[in-house]
A protein has these predicted regions:
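A structural preference for short, hydrophobic beta-strand core positions in alpha/beta folds
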Residues: 25-26, 149
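Short, mixed-charge, low-aromatic patches
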Residues: 15-24, 88-96
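N-terminal beta1-alpha1 ligand-phosphate binding loop
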Residues: 1-21, 27-31
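Flexible, gly/pro- and Lys/Arg-enriched active-site loops
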Residues: 35-44, 54-60, 64-150
Length: 150
């Protein structure tokens, strides 16, 4: 997986270079316990806030291209170790559910490794489907995930 912090910094820079995308917020970095597959190293996680005119599907395609072209990601083990994983959590108030994209991200409200860094940059942001703020979702979360600010 290489230098996890450097990978996050490179990913932030790559996303910031996308046309019609401006990084307007970056959470602190967190070291988090793996979810879904046991026996693997911890992950580093962060959340970016973007201002973009790109439609959701096009933004997702560009994020996936960064994963493959810059970080040589090949998808083998679901939830397995990888150098970088760029997820699109929200796109304004968009609600999408198709073969390629689900917005809001279907498991974001269940994951401390998503909610904690999201809380750091937009605690009052409301989940478009649940109608609850990030702060409310985080306070209600019952999870044994370890999430440590680095």
């Amino acid at each position: 997986m290489g230098d996890r912090e450097l990978n996050l910094l490179r990913a932030v820079a790559e996303v910031g270079r996308l046309p019609d995308c401006k990084v307007t917020g970056l959470s602190p970095f967190y070291e988090t316990s793996p979810v879904g597959v046991a026996g693997q190293p911890s992950f580093y996680n962060a959340v970016l806030r973007l201002h973009t005119s790109l439609p959701p599907h096009e933004l997702l395609e560009r994020l996936l291209r960064i994963e493959t072209d810059v970080f040589s990601r090949t998808r083998t083990t679901h939830w397995g170790p990888r150098r970088i994983d760029l997820d699109l959590l929200l796109h304004g108030e968009a609600i999408i559910s198709d073969d390629r994209l689900k917005l809001p991200h279907p498991r974001m409200a269940e994951r401390r490794f998503v909610l904690q860094p999201l809380y750091d940059i937009v605690p009052d942001l409301r989940h478009p489907l649940l109608g609850r703020s990030v702060a409310e979702l985080l306070a209600a979360l019952r999870s044994d995930e370890t999430v440590t600010r680095i």
